[in-house]
Regions:
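N-terminal secretory signal peptides that target proteins for export/translocation
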Residues: 1-15
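N-terminal active-site segment of His-dependent metallophosphoesterases
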Residues: 40-98, 247
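Active-site neighborhood of phospho(di)ester-bond hydrolases with catalytic His/Asp-centered motifs
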Residues: 51-53, 80-85, 114-119, 253-254, ...
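A short C-terminal boundary segment appended to hydrolase-like catalytic domains
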Residues: 345-374
Length: 374
């Protein structure tokens, strides 16, 4: 996301140190055995993963992101979930050379496996003049060939440069959309659809939105509708797997903030989200969360400030606006740092605890902004 809703001061106020560590209660406590997608399933036990997104952005991000990577590599996490946007939407060019450079200069620097969902800045927004004026679909093809699947059909793994995690994480990919991934690991099912910001690449008619995004170039309903249907099918399949495996919880990774709040847009600086473009994915998440009954965690980036909330409300199985209907207590959303706020979140997962998810914020000392006293 590149049209920020909040000022820097407002964003900093949103981060309250009192909430740096918090737990979200599970709806059901039991003992579960992980059903990994490889032949050798491992018993589930407490472990940690890193949650990051929206980096490296611009010169500041290029300088600060290595500090984040170094902290993650020095930690005891098992893997990293990256919620997209490897470049800024306001100036980083979508050149052919940019993508392999990100592979070697960013993704390959992580010691443990990294799982990545595609952001809008990598392809949807590449038609903007400031990003080079490229055809978005040509950039999407480069994202796929550099980060997900080679021309010979071989799937690409990210991170794991030290080979320190067993290869038993058997990752499933959709045949038509290689970026759609799914796997089971230590009692948790991970589902990765492809849901970027900038209205999910749908054709948006709002004049202010189109002005912000270089007029009529924006959006492709043919691409959007096909991928949207694939996303819904993938989410359904992932939850079916979670139920069959007896998973203690489900984690879903997307890039876009899918506008759970439903508030009005600022016409002077229109936001990248469009509620209608995410409706089918959100409904699929609701339907499956209600059926699954156990804890579900949605991770997204896009906004660049850290936040944990329970944004899902429903009436008769349909989504309703926040604070209306009934709160879906087994659905939690975590939004990661990013852009000018280059820090990371540790998710501690304990399949045997009534508190399945515990969030621990890691503020990278070298990346702190200097604030003058008033």
């Amino acid at each position: 996301m590149n049209a920020a809703r909040m000022t820097t001061t407002q964003k900093l106020k949103r981060f309250n140190p009192l909430f740096a560590i918090l737990t979200i209660g599970a709806m059901t406590a039991a003992l579960f055995i992980a059903a990994d997608s490889s032949a050798n399933a491992a018993q589930s036990y407490k472990y940690s993963i890193a949650l990051i997104g929206d980096m490296p952005y611009d010169a500041k991000g290029v300088t600060q992101t290595p500090n984040v990577i170094n902290e993650i590599n020095a930690s005891r996490i098992d893997l990293t979930l990256f919620d997209g946007d490897t470049m800024s939407g306001k100036g980083d060019k979508c050149t052919d050379a940019a993508y392999p450079a990100l592979k070697t200069g960013f993704f390959d620097k992580f010691f443990k496996p990294l799982f990545y969902t595609i952001g809008d800045n990598e392809w949807v927004d590449c038609d903007r003049a400031v990003k080079g004026g490229f055809d978005p679909l040509s950039r999407l093809a480069l994202v796929r060939s550099n980060f997900f699947q080679k021309a010979d059909g071989t799937y690409i793994t990210l991170g794991n440069s030290m080979g320190t995690t067993p290869s038993r994480i058997g990752v499933m990919h959709d045949s038509a959309y290689p970026e759609l991934q799914m796997f089971s690991y230590k009692g948790i099912t991970y589902i990765i659809p492809h849901v970027p910001g900038s209205a999910n690449n749908s054709a948006v008619a709002t004049p202010t939105f189109k002005t912000y995004n270089d007029a009529a170039k924006d959006g492709d309903d043919v691409e959007y509708k096909a991928r949207d249907a694939a996303n819904v099918a993938w989410i359904n399949k992932g939850f079916e797997k979670a139920i069959a495996d007896g998973s203690a919880g489900v984690i879903v990774l997307v890039q876009a903030n899918m506008d759970w709040e439903g508030y009005a847009r600022d016409a002077a600086a229109p936001n990248n989200e469009n509620t209608a473009a995410f409706a089918n994915v959100k409904q699929a998440l609701l339907t499956n969360t209600l059926k699954f009954k156990k804890p579900v965690l949605l991770q997204n980036g896009d906004e660049h400030w850290y936040q944990v909330d329970m944004p899902m409300n429903e009436t008769a199985g349909k989504l309703v606006e926040k604070d209306k209907g009934s709160l879906v207590e087994n659905f939690t959303r975590v939004q990661t740092f990013g852009s000018g706020f280059n820090h990371w979140v540790e998710l501690i997962i304990d399949p045997h605890s009534t508190n399945l998810w515990t969030f621990k914020v890691h503020i990278v000392k070298e990346n702190l902004d200097v604030h003058a006293a008033s």
